[in-house]
């Protein structure tokens, strides 16, 4: 009998084209939507982390080769539908919508109903989304991360003791939301202005951290425990940004400089770095993965400090998986560099989760 797999997802609503001259700096998301999508400027990044039909269809097609798939949109009907269908396990790519614990909603509902699920548990999902709490745990566990504070008001930013330059971002958002060239603050006036803007825009605390001027990398991790492994490292090619632009992959790079007619080829995989640095990057990524007790898969963002030492920036236990190779979706890019097709990636992740849940190989059951 085929394994019954429930796919939990959030479907991105249709949105009008982005008007010419739009300048909202909060359009960016954890990774850019596909090139066909432009967000509604009335709610510029509210749904930025949700998936388009093409992504959901691609995941369904891949999972259908290893089981019977049930689509479970993670809306208000999700708990009742999950209780009714009761799949053998849930493959979770749902990001949630409201609150700092939104990425924990689906796994928490699964646990409440006793339905096994893939990827990290509610605690890990909540901690990873709260950048301040995640950095506290990383620091306590000795995982390298930049010095930081969490500011709840402009007054706290004004009293910050960290040396400039500093980098600021919302505490509870995906890695791109609220990140722009204005996030790099070189003096107290810029810092207070940007912190004020982010608090007013997102109604949440702001992480203020030492700016890391070195190379930036993304590491895709698969597996659990000692079997956790890194896929080829992705490097950020900041030399592809316009002349004079600061080395920041934020709103401007995702929405202004990267266009369908002139793609910004900023990702390089495998990254062109020395073997010793690559080993340090992988070690830092795995240390962070284990410190937050991630499961099955995760993406870890890393940037080097002024001395060239890798520092963990943040973790994403619900990484994006856009199927179009032209899109900047890191996990599929890393998988492709490892010789895996998109379907191979999704099947492998499902197999990793099913082995953890049942002790059996999902791939072997359909062989």
Segment roles from a protein language model:
Residues 137-142, 272-367:
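ATP-dependent carboxylate activation and anion-phosphoryl transfer catalytic cores
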Residues 19-35, 246-256, 324-328:
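Short, flexible, mixed-charge acidic loops at enzyme active sites
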Residues 69, 116-117, 145, 166, ...:
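Hydrophobic beta-strand scaffold residues
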Residues 1-8, 39, 83-86, 125-216, ...:
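Active-site nucleotide/adenylate-binding loops and adjacent lid/helix of ATP-dependent enzymes
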């Amino acid at each position: 009998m085929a394994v019954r797999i429930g796919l939990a997802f959030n479907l991105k609503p249709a949105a009008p084209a982005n008007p010419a001259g739009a300048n909202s700096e909060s359009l960016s998301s954890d990774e850019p939507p596909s090139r066909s999508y432009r967000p509604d400027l009335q709610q510029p990044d509210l749904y930025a982390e949700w998936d388009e039909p093409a992504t959901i269809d691609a995941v369904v097609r891949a999972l259908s080769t290893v089981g019977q798939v049930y689509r479970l949109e993670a809306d208000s009907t999700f708990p009742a539908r999950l209780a009714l269908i009761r799949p053998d396990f849930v493959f979770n790519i749902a990001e949630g919508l409201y609150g700092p614990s939104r990425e924990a909603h689906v796994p928490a509902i699964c646990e409440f109903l006793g339905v096994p699920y893939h990827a990290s548990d509610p605690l890990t999902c909540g901690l990873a989304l709260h950048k301040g709490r995640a950095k506290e745990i990383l620091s306590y566990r000795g995982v390298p991360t930049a010095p930081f504070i969490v500011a709840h008001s402009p007054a706290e930013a004004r009293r910050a003791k960290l040396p400039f330059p500093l980098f600021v971002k919302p505490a509870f958002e995906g890695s791109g939301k609220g990140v722009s060239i204005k996030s790099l603050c070189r003096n107290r006036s810029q810092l207070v202005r940007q912190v004020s803007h982010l608090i007013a825009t997102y109604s949440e605390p702001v992480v203020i951290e030492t700016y890391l001027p070195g190379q930036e990398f993304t590491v895709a991790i698969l597996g659990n425990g000692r079997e956790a492994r890194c896929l080829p490292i992705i490097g950020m090619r900041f030399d592809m940004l316009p002349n004079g632009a600061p080395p920041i992959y934020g709103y401007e790079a995702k929405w202004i400089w990267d266009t369908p007619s002139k793609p910004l080829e900023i990702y390089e995989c495998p990254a062109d770095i020395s073997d010793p640095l690559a080993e340090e990057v992988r070690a830092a990524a795995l240390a962070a993965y284990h410190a937050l007790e991630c499961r099955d898969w995760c993406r870890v963002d890393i940037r080097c400090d002024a001395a060239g030492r890798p520092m963990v920036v943040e973790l994403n236990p619900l990484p994006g998986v856009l199927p179009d190779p032209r899109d900047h979706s890191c996990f599929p890019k890393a998988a492709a560099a490892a010789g895996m097709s998109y379907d191979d990636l999704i099947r492998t992740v499902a197999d990793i989760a099913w082995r953890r849940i049942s002790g059996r190989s999902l791939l072997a059951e359909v062989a």
